[in-house]
Amino acid sequence: MLALSLLALGLLAEVAPASCQQGLGNLQPWMQGLIAVAVFLVLVAIAFAVNHFWCQEEQEPGSTMMITGNKADGVLVGMDGRYSSMASGFRSSEHKNAFENVLEEEGRVRSTPM
């Protein structure tokens, strides 16, 4: 078996290399650069799309909008009695338009080191 593999290796070493690829001509350097930039931008767009769909976070049930019973209490035009349920969690008891500063849970806070 060793002799057969050595014979095949020797034959492959003696055979002249094949030149199978004959191009129609070399592209101009500016055309090569343009093609390289286009391919790079396509790859970046694909990476952004994959990142967007792959790393998409599920919406928390507490962050959805809820409808209240009284439409006359609507604050914003176009909201028609809707409010964010997140705002009701830290609304102040002292004044109806004041809010408390609530500490966030450690796992939910995103921060970047400087």
From Swiss-Prot:
Q: Which family does it belong to?
A: Belongs to the PDZK1-interacting protein 1/SMIM24 family.
Protein localization: Apical cell membrane
Q: Which UniProt keywords apply?
A: Cell membrane, Membrane, Phosphoprotein, Transmembrane, Transmembrane helix
Cellular component aspect of the GO annotation: apical plasma membrane
> Which positions, given as ranges, span the membrane?
29-51
Cytoplasmic side, ranges: 52-114
Assembly and partners are described as: Forms a heterodimer (via N-terminal transmembrane helix) with SLC5A2/SGLT2 (via TM13); this interaction enhances SLC5A2 transporter activity. Interacts with PDZK1.
Q: Report what the protein is called.
A: PDZK1-interacting protein 1
Topology with respect to the bilayer: Single-pass membrane protein
Kindly report every residue range on the membrane side named Extracellular. 1-28
